[in-house]
Amino acid sequence: MPLSKRIIPCLDVDNGRVVKGIKFRGVKDAGDPVELAKKYSDQGADELVFLDITASKQDREIMKSMVKKVASVIDIPFTVGGGIKTLADAREILLNGADKVSINTASVKNPELVKELMKIFGRQCIVVAIDVKRNYETDDKHTTTSGPDKDYYFEVMIYGGSKGTGIDAIQWAKKVEELGAGEILLTSIDADGTKNGYDIELTNTICNNVRIPVIASGGCGSSEHMVEVFNKTDVDAVLAASIFHYDKLTLEKVKKNLAQKGIQTRL
């Protein structure tokens, strides 16, 4: 029997409010994190992801009090990321109610952190978030893809998508799996906030190169987009924000639509 696919709302939090932008830019207010978290948990979300989107860029700690408040109103698995740089940071977040920690910039700066976290907290606790953007300045180090006009590679971006690393996302995904990541949260910056659908090419490429679960993120504008990414890739879960925050769709409706298309979710 195939494993059920997971539907995961995402709270991008900045200064204590949930926000949403397009391609990681031009963010606008989307509501209160605690209220939205409770709503999604009550509606039947499989998990919840909370990302403090400016913690790394501003070199500050994540908002632990907010994490604790959110954890107190939900009864589903809870992943928290943003500004986690050390074992102590991760421990604090887990003690404040998170079930998993997500690391992004810190894993690029210090890959051994992934291994250390896995050894202490277990693989099932560790999510490595990979933010990716197409880069058309390629060289021999990169796995290139032919575009209509020019070849490109999938580049890993850090600091909330604001800084390129020159790292090939395919090679990086394999590396974090080897280091002990339990799953990968894969966000396409090219698709983020556009509501034009998930980045099928990127998602498929990463899924085909790792064995750990991959969560697709960026671009969801309808339940049809979820159907498409589940049918065209081996992704285990989808992350969505805009369609839930602005009440375009409820989680019940999404799961019903997926069931009608033969996609099994956790009811």
Regions found by a protein language model. Name each.
Residues E47-M66, T105, L185-N196:
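Glycine-rich, proline-tolerant flexible connector loops at the mouths of alpha/beta enzymes
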Residues V13-N15, V19, A98-L186, D190-A191:
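Conserved anion-binding
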Residues Q58-G81, E116-D131, K195-S222, G262-I263:
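Alpha-helix-loop-beta-strand connector modules within alpha/beta enzyme cores
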Residues D29-S41, K85-R91, T165-K175, S223-M226:
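Short, acidic/polar
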Residues D12, Y40, L48, V80, ...:
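Conserved, mostly hydrophobic/aromatic
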Residues F78-T79, I84-V101, E201-V238:
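Catalytic cores of alpha/beta
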Residues R6-C10, E47, D75-T79, K100-S102, ...:
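Structural preference for beta-strand elements that scaffold enzyme active sites
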Residues L113-F121, V227-L267:
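C-terminal helical cap(s) of enzyme catalytic domains, especially alpha/beta-barrels
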